Amino acid sequence: YAITKCSFFTKSGITTKYLLLGYGIKLFGGFAYGYIYSHWYSGGDTWEYFDCSKLMHDAFYVNPRYYFQLVFGSCNYTPTDAEFLKIITPIAHWSDERTYFILRINAILQWFSFGNYYVHTVFWVFFSMLGTVAFYRTLKVYFPNYTIFMYVLLFLQPSIFFWGSGVHKDGLTLMAL
């Protein structure tokens, strides 16, 4: 819905039809990414991020303070609370702030996804779509005669189509462009 109504998308120069097509293509790439990693690579980082975010989310039901500490607090300390230690021990990347950021976002998305990985993919693809459209808008200024080529390049290039659509760092990196 946001893609068809938000001026950031509608004023991009890409018609609504092609915006939705691009989003659908990216969704397919994101779903394929999750499926491939769950069936051929034993989950990989993408499923590990999701599973760890579920542990973070479930901490809310043990003690809401734990959840807020995990999602918004610093991870550069050693907790002394035994119950909290029990929660964070299985969470990978606890002390790696760069990777832990992905877990934080996924822990917040857990409230909307009800624990479904593919709902996270829908959000992640939207984040990635923001970057893809922003990149298109920027390139359009410099190359106004190549809009079709840019659309194909940005929505069908394998690295953007597949890697940029999964629940992983690449989608956020694309958004940050």
PLM region spans:
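Extracytoplasmic catalytic/substrate-binding loops of multi-pass membrane glycan-assembly enzymes
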Residues: Y37-C52, Y61-E83, H93-I105
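Loop-to-helix entry region of an early transmembrane alpha helix in multi-pass inner-membrane enzymes
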Residues: A92-R104, F112-L130
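Transmembrane and membrane-interface helices of multi-pass
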Residues: M150-Q157
